[in-house]
Structure formats: structure tokens, C-alpha cells
Amino acid sequence: MAKPFFSLQKFLRRAQFFLFFLTVAYLMAGSLLLLQRSYLVIQQSNRGTVGNLGLSADSVGDQYIDHRMVPKGLAKLHAKNLLTQRHGVIDQPLWLITRNSELRQLRRRWFHNFVKDQDPSLGTPSKVVKHMLVNKGTYVGCFVDNAEKRTLKATVFFDLRKMTVSHCQDACAERTYVYAGLAYGSECYCGNHLPLNRAKEEECNNECKGEKGSVCGGVNRLSVFRLEDLHVSAKQRRNVTYRGCFRAPENVTRIFPVSFPNLTVEMCSEFCSDKEYPLAIVKWTECFCGYPTGQFNLYEPLDESLCAGYLNGTNESEALREENYCSVYQTPIQDTRCTDRKFLPIKSKVFIALSSFPGAGNTWVRHLIEHATGYYTGSYYFDGTLYNKGFKGEKDHWRSGRTICVKTHESGKREIEMYDSSILLIRNPYKALIAEFNRKCGGHLGYATEKHWTSREWPEFVNSYASWWASHALDWLQYGRKLLVVHYEDLKMDLIGKLREMLAFLKVPINEDRLLCVENNKDGNFKRLGSSQSSLEPFTQEMKNVIDGYIRTVDKALKARNFSGLPEEYMPR
């Protein structure tokens, strides 16, 4: 009897130790889990939520997260120059992670800028902010903003981070407008006519994004300023561009809605600017104002000497007077027939890539496509600078289906096969490398300094990026399902013709007025003005030898896919 009792007692003692260890293990596991959860909560609170980023919950799921790669191996082409360095996963949201450092930095910059700029007033009752005293211009009042019948429509631009009253006034005055209007805290509208309907002052209650305490309109409301003093001083620096000599249409008075006799070129340009027309047409001493049309499209300029008589007042001009020649000038007025854009009304199930190597003109082509189609373009990345300048599709997830096409610099089989069709934009690698290095050092509109060009950074940049230019094109030629190849240089030479090809590829109906408007405003707001100050030749002979080898290989690959080869200017001399 005693033996079974001691056996039971021994078992219970062992069971106690066993339960004790189980309890300790359970508590330790629970503590670790609690600490991990607390860490994630703190991490999310510091970075913002998916909702703050404008992404759906699905957009951060496995089905949308792909590990990005620098272009894969470039066979037989200086493999040692390829970007094959692996980057470890750092502590940040998954959608920020990419193996290409440039793209990762781009996403990280957008992420931090966007989180920083979240409006703390969202969800709180609106309050009236007092108008600050403004030295430039005179505040007129709060007016109703009707998007369909907008009065201040001559020039429209956005700045969702840094819009101020002075910024809008200066921009409108520079273009010689009389009135500047601000809405939604970030939108600026210019024009020469005051809106018709006034609104209550308290309805203009949106604080300017870049200036605390000042008012920049409201929802469908404009804070309007008169720029009379600035307008007078701006006339001295009026930005009028000579477009060329053209043959005037036969029914000139019917095509151009406004005309005035006996005006000089300067007077005609000022007259048409005041009437808010983008073109001033001078035929002898007659002045006409209007837009490019199908009958007068500015596609075929004539020899300058044919219009010289008008300007010089020579005897020859008497003979020319009987001919239908005219001189055309671009006024500061923006052609607004193609500035309205929107998201696709029905989500598309077809994903079309607008693919290019960085520096190949992707942003410029997006500007052309958006204004020609009227629909926003999307992006595989999130560039806050572009979003703040009006590329509203930049914020949408690339698979939202609401944009006409999606910008990408990615390559590799997996990344390319995610798209149903693609527009491959190719630019001369010498020009593309310089453009991307300028963007990297000076931003979208700036230039690298001479110090940058002579530093070690430039050779390292060429060593890495030159091979990427080649492998990017080769990968898309190999894995792209349905491909349209567009050369940047061809687009510059034949803008309308190449735009028609792209619109047909995108299956978008062609609107002739929008195309004429695009041609009239083809540069947009992302063209680098002037030229780089550096006169140095940035490419060494060794660099040229490597790049020329890449050019020959891409040219051969294009012809193998039955595309025309690279333009002659690419080819090594």
C-alpha cells in the first residue's frame, strides 16, 4: 500500500515542476508577443497608416508587393558594371523596400513628405481664418467657383504643399493677368475678368497649404485678388514668344474670333493677352487673336523671309501684302482647352505601362498623354513633388485601374509581365544619363553643378546607370507582351504624329482640339529652362566606349523584334 502512495507522490512532484516550467514558458511567450505588438503599434503611429497614404488594405497585401530589382544581367556586356549589389531589408513599410537605391529613396521621400503634410484640421469643424495683410495686390472678396463656367481659367496650377497668396499673385502677375484666385488651399487660377457671383466671406475658410493664418479660398470658393499694380510692372517683362511665319487661312476673320486694325506687334500681343487668347497673329498691320485650329494648326511654318517685309516695312512688303502670310506670336495666356483632367470613370482591368529609363522624359510624356486624353496617368512610385504639381494619379496605387497608364522604371521578367501592354520610351543614353544626373543633383527643374560633374559621384553614376539603360530596354523587348516603342527624339520632331500613335495604342478617341492645345503647351511645367552652366565634356573616352557598346546591342535587339533601330544620332561615329 505504501509503495503505490510514494509512487503517486513522486509523480505529483514531477508534475508540479512540469507545470511550473510550462507556466514560465507561457508567460515568456506572452511577454514577447506583447512587446512585439507594442513595437508595431508605436511604429505605425510614427509612420502613419495605410489609410493616410491613400492606399487600400489590399494594396499592401502579398498580391501587390513585389521585390524590386535593378535590371537583371546583361549578357555579354560588361557584367561587372551591372547593379547587382543586394540591399538588406531595413525597418520600414514593405512598399518602401526596393533593391534599387534610387527608387527606394524616391518612395521614402514621398512617404515622409506625405505623412508630414497630413492636414491636422481634417475631421474638425471649419473655422474662418482672417485674411492677412498682403502687400501685393488688393483683396477683392470671396466668390463662387463654378468648374463648368469658370471665369478665372486662363492659367491654372496647383501646389499641394507650398501654395501661398504671394506665390499665386506672382505667378498670375508674371503672366500679366489682372486677377488671381485661390481655392481649396492649394489651387491658383488667373484671369482678366472678375467672377460674377459673390459668396459669404466665411465660406472662404481654407488655410493656405504653405502659409499658416492666410486664406486660400474654400470648397468651390475663390479668394480673389486684383493685381493692377503688379500687372503694370509685369508688362515690361511680358513673355511673348515668336512661333514663326505661316500661311494665313482664307477666311481669317471667321477663324479668329477677335481682330483689331493698325496695331504693331507689341500692341497686338498686349491686346490678345488682355483678351485672354494664347495666339497673336499679325497680318500686315491687322491684328488677330485666337487659338490653333484645324484650319490654322501651326504644323508647317514657312521661310522667315516671307514675313520679313511685315516687320521691316520694306518695299517688298507691298507685294507680300497680297499674299496670305502672317507672323504668329505666343502670348503668356495658357490654352485651357486641354487642362481639364480626371480619373477614368470606369476602372480599367488592363494595365498599361509607360516604361523608361530614368531621365528619358517620362514625366514630359505623362504631361502630353494627360492633356491629350483628359485622364490622369499613374505611377509605380510615389513622387510627392510631381503630385504637388498636379499629377494627381501619382497618389493612386498603380493597380487602382483609375489611370490611363502607369509610369515605371522597373525591369525584369516578373515586373514586366504584370502589365498587359507597354509603351517603351527610349532616349539617347548620353542625354538620358545627363538628364537623370541633373535631376539627382538639382531636382526636376535644376542642374548639377560643376562640382558634381568633377566629383567621384559622376563616374560612379555612369558606371552603374549606363548598363541599366541597356538592360532596361533589353528586358522590355524580351518580356513585354504588347509593346509600342517610342523614341524621345522622334517625339520631339513629330509631336502630333507620335501622340496619335500613343493614343491609338491606349485605345483613346482622338480629340483634335486637345491635340492642338497640347502642341500649343507642349513643354508643360517640367522643362528645364536655360542650359547647364558647365561647359565640361562629362564623358571620358572609356565611358563612351562602354556606352557605344550598349547602343549597338539595343539597336540589334530592336531590329530582332521587327522594330526600327535606334535613331542615327545614337549610333557611334
UniProtKB/Swiss-Prot annotation:
Glycans are attached at N239, N251, N262, N312, N315, N562. Residues 136-228, 239-332 form the WSC domain. Keywords: Glycoprotein, Golgi apparatus, Membrane, Repeat, Signal-anchor, Transmembrane, Transmembrane helix. GO terms for cellular component: Golgi membrane. It is a single-pass type II membrane protein. It is found in: Golgi apparatus membrane. Residues 36-573 are extracellular. It comes from the Eukaryota. Pfam families: Sulfotransfer_1 (PF00685), WSC (PF01822). The chain crosses the membrane at residues 15-35. Sialate:O-sulfotransferase which catalyzes 8-O-sulfation at the Sia-glycan level using 3'-phosphoadenosine 5'-phosphosulfate (PAPS) as a donor, forming 8-O-sulfated Sia (Sia8S)-glycans. Belongs to the WSCD family. This is Sialate:O-sulfotransferase 1. It comes from Xenopus tropicalis.
